[in-house]
């Protein structure tokens, strides 16, 4: 089944090819039509391609995110190519095959044109002489019209007589004027194939041959010299074509010996006359003009009767016999000669027109396509090089980012451990120094000098100033002992941090790191708050005899227990509770289990209680002592006791009170300051930790800025690589498209411009 289908397709294809070949064989002018259609299509594609390339290059040149991969000169060049291609496309759209008919007046130029068109399009015959250039072209409309030179007005023409009348009525027309006669294609099939026929005034009536050639002949593909077979070639005719040959390289020239039907009246001289005309025309074409060789000359010289052909074709068009009417003998031979002329003319003009009209533009199109291809290739290479550079830069930044992250993690662990060691050392130094300063507190208090008075107002001021003195003195001494070493250690640590993190920063920031990281002079704040710490200090500067009962009890028991003993609070002495529940079966604890301190307090308390109950106790005791030692010893003892009391009472001055006050304050303040040694050491270590942590955090902030910049650069590189990938792909596509257009132009050249072997 598939084989049958393939054979059917082959048969259809063969039939189509045969039909196409038949059309080409039937009308060689189709060669130009198909070539024109092909080249117009190629130029349309070329224009679209250059438009796309120009837009692409302009967008690429304006893209500020990419480094320059194209130049403004390249953009302008491609835009220039676009305008050139558009201009060529407009020229190609107007291109057509052009044949120019020249000859002396009344040689039958218009009749030849009418015969070729199978209709009486141009005025001809007796009384009708062409007085200007007539350009006959086809129009898709159904009405004929004419256009005069310099005017866009379409003048309607329905018949040949109207055309003749219009041409003769226009007084502005002269021999060098051009009138375009647009005839419906439906009436003249020859005009459908982009063929333009140009009739001219007789070349024997003007001397403006040079201007005619420049104005009307330079774009002609074929020249037809319509000669009168009843006479030989005139010098005027030869002179004109000599000028044409000087302006154009090897012009295509046909010679029609018209009115050959007159030879039928003298048949005995026909061949001799034909031979003479052939020799002279061949000599003119070959020897004088050099446009053909002798082998080709026979295909350029014809003997016809245009009037007979026109009459026969008009009759045939009207449905009458072709040979009807009064026709001279040999009509069929002359008809065949005219048809042979038409065949040779069509083949010549189609080949010549394709070559002259399209070859130069084809070469120019190839040059433009190649130029744009080279631009796209250079852009592709530049984008590829930039992409490789971006990939290398991205890899470098990614490696840098990984190095920063790893190094920052290691440094953070190391600095965290070192900060911990430094803070512990600071706490130890401050605690040791403060303990030593507390032991020397009495010296600091003794250095305090201010007028002392026991009045409450003066004492309040005295204590406030003493607090300030202690605060400043302790702070100064601690600063002298600790601050310098701690500050030096802190600065060393900060410099180590800077040196460790500096390699993680970009080179531009390394020299500015000292300005970026604040380096304030660090000062420890000990913050002892002596005024609040000693706010509840209660001095005792009343006179107390050293051998008095209260002082003795205080000396043995201490201030706290003596107060309890003297006030009779023995019942409030707390026994320690047993750690286990009491067991009735167990014997009570022995009395000796009481502590020695509790026993002493109990005894003295009992004694004091006894003496306080009755004065008789004193008498009893005194009597007992009296009996034991005698009155003299007692009297002496009381005398010495009294003298000692008087001495101490007299020496209890303001200075003594101040010394007692300072001694009491030293004891009290020392006890209080001992409580905050650990707190002060921790506070100082916390300050150092905050300072070092702040420095490290600020350095890390700069590193984070560097990391963010690297991440942004990596993201920008990724975006740039994507843009370059797209750019490369587009440039490669456009480069390949230029190659495809070049292959299309090569195919066109091979098919239409190169001579067939």
Curated annotation (Swiss-Prot):
Catalytic activity entry: GTP + H2O = GDP + phosphate + H(+)
Tissue expression notes: Ubiquitous. Expression is markedly reduced in ApoE-knockout mouse atherosclerotic arteries.
Effect of disrupting the coding gene: Mutant mice die early during embryonic development. Heart-specific disruption causes cardiomyopathy in aging mice, characterized by dilated hearts that are insensitive to beta-adrenergic stimulation and impaired contractile performance. Mutant cardiomyocytes display mitochondrial enlargement with respiratory impairment.
Top-rank taxon: Eukaryota
Location of the region described as G1 motif in the Swiss-Prot/TrEMBL record: 103-110
Subcellular location: Mitochondrion outer membrane
Ranges for domain Dynamin-type G: 93-342
Chain spans, region G4 motif: 258-261
GO biological process entries: aerobic respiration; apoptotic process; blastocyst formation; camera-type eye morphogenesis; mitochondrial fusion; mitochondrial membrane organization; mitochondrion localization; negative regulation of Ras protein signal transduction
Transmembrane stretches, start-end: 605-625, 627-647
Chief localisation class: mitochondrion
Region feature (G2 motif): 129-130
Mitochondrial intermembrane side, ranges: 626
Region annotation (G3 motif) ranges: 199-202
Modified residues (Phosphothreonine): 111
Top EC class, one word: hydrolase
Ranges in coiled-coil conformation: 406-434, 696-738
Keyword tags: Apoptosis, Autophagy, Coiled coil, Developmental protein, GTP-binding, Hydrolase, Membrane, Mitochondrion, Mitochondrion outer membrane, Nucleotide-binding, Phosphoprotein, Transmembrane, Transmembrane helix, Ubl conjugation, Unfolded protein response
GO cellular component: cytosol; microtubule cytoskeleton; mitochondrial outer membrane; mitochondrion
Post-translational modification (record): Phosphorylated by PINK1. Ubiquitinated by non-degradative ubiquitin by PRKN, promoting mitochondrial fusion; deubiquitination by USP30 inhibits mitochondrial fusion. Ubiquitinated by HUWE1 when dietary stearate (C18:0) levels are low; ubiquitination inhibits mitochondrial fusion.
Signal peptide span: none
Free-text domain note: A helix bundle is formed by helices from the N-terminal and the C-terminal part of the protein. The GTPase domain cannot be expressed by itself, without the helix bundle. Rearrangement of the helix bundle and/or of the coiled coil domains may bring membranes from adjacent mitochondria into close contact, and thereby play a role in mitochondrial fusion.
Primary role: Mitochondrial outer membrane GTPase that mediates mitochondrial clustering and fusion. Mitochondria are highly dynamic organelles, and their morphology is determined by the equilibrium between mitochondrial fusion and fission events. Overexpression induces the formation of mitochondrial networks. Membrane clustering requires GTPase activity and may involve a major rearrangement of the coiled coil domains. Plays a central role in mitochondrial metabolism and may be associated with obesity and/or apoptosis processes.
Protein name from the UniProt record: Mitofusin-2
Organism listed in the record: Mus musculus (Mouse)
Lineage: Eukaryota, Metazoa, Chordata, Craniata, Vertebrata
């Amino acid at each position: 089944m598939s084989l049958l289908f393939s054979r059917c397709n082959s048969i259809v294809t063969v039939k189509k090819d045969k039909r196409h070949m038949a059309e080409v064989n039937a009308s060689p002018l189709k060669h130009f039509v198909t070539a024109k259609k092909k080249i117009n299509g190629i130029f349309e594609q070329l224009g679209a391609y250059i438009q796309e390339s120009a837009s692409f290059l302009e967008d690429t040149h304006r893209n500020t995110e990419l480094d320059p991969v194209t130049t403004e000169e390249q953009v302008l060049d491609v835009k220039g190519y676009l305008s050139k291609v558009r201009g060529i496309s407009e020229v190609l759209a107007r291109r057509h095959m052009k044949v120019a008919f020249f000859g002396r007046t009344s040689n039958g130029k218009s009749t030849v044109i009418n015969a070729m068109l199978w209709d009486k399009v141009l005025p001809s015959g007796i009384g009708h002489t062409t007085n200007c250039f007539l350009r006959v072209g086809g129009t898709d409309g159904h009405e004929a019209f004419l256009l005069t030179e310099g005017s866009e007005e379409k003048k309607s023409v329905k018949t040949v007589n109207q055309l003749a009348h219009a041409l003769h009525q226009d007084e502005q027309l002269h021999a060098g004027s051009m009138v375009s006669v647009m005839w419906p294609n439906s009436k003249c099939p020859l005009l459908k194939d982009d063929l333009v026929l140009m009739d001219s005034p007789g070349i024997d009536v003007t001397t403006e041959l040079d201007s005619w050639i420049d104005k009307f002949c330079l774009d002609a593909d074929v020249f037809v010299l319509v000669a009168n077979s009843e006479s030989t070639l005139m010098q005027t005719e030869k002179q004109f074509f000599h000028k044409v040959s000087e302006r154009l390289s090897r012009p295509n020239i046909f010679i029609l010996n018209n009115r050959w039907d007159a030879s039928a009246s003298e048949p005995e001289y026909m061949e001799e006359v034909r031979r003479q005309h052939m020799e002279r025309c061949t000599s003119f074409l070959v020897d004088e003009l050099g446009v053909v060789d002798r082998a080709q000359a026979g295909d350029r010289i014809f003997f016809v009767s245009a009037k007979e052909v026109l009459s026969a074709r008009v009759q045939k068009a009207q449905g009458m016999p072709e040979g009807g009417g009064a026709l001279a003998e040999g009509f069929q031979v002359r008809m065949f000669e005219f048809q042979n002329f038409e065949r040779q003319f069509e083949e010549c003009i189609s080949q010549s027109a394709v070559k002259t009209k399209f070859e130069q533009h084809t070469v120019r199109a190839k040059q433009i396509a190649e130029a744009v291809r080279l631009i796209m290739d250079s852009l592709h290479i530049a984008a590829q090089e930039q992409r490789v550079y971006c990939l290398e830069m991205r890899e470098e930044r990614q490696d840098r980012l990984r190095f920063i992250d790893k190094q920052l993690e290691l440094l953070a662990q190391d600095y965290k451990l070192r900060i911990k060691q430094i803070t512990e050392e600071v706490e130890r130094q401050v605690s040791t120094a403060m303990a030593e300063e507390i032991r020397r507190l009495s010296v600091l208090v003794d250095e305090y000098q201010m007028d002392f008075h026991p009045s409450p107002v003066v004492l309040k001021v005295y204590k406030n100033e003493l607090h300030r003195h202690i605060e400043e003195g302790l702070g100064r001494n601690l600063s002298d002992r600790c601050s310098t070493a701690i500050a030096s250690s802190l600065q060393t640590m900060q410099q180590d941090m800077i040196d460790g993190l500096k390699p993680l920063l970009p080179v531009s920031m390394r020299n500015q790191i000292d300005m970026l990281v604040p380096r304030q002079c660090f000062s420890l704040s000990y913050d002892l708050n002596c005024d609040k710490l000693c706010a509840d200090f209660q001095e005792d500067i009343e006179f107390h005899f050293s051998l008095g009962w209260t002082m003795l009890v205080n000396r043995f028991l201490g201030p706290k227990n003596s107060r309890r003993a003297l006030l009779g609070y023995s019942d409030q002495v707390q026994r320690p509770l047993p750690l286990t529940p009491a067991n009735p079966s167990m014997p009570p604890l022995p009395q000796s289990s009481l502590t020695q301190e509790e026993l002493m307090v109990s005894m003295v308390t009992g004694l004091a209680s006894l003496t306080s109950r009755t004065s008789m106790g004193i008498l009893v005791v005194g009597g007992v002592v009296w009996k034991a030692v005698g009155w003299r010893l007692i009297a002496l003892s009381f005398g010495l006791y009294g003298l000692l009391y008087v001495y101490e009472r007299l020496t209890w001055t303001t200075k003594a009170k101040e010394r007692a006050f300072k001694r009491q304050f030293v004891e009290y303040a020392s006890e209080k300051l001992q409580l905050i040694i650990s707190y002060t050491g921790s506070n100082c270590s916390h300050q150092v930790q905050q300072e070092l942590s702040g420095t490290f955090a600020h350095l890390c902030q700069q590193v984070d800025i560097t990391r963010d910049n690297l991440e942004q650069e990596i993201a920008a590189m990724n975006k740039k690589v994507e843009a370059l990938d797209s750019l490369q792909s587009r440039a490669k596509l456009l480069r390949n498209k230029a190659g495809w257009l070049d292959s299309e132009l090569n195919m066109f050249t091979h098919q239409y411009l190169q001579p067939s072997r």
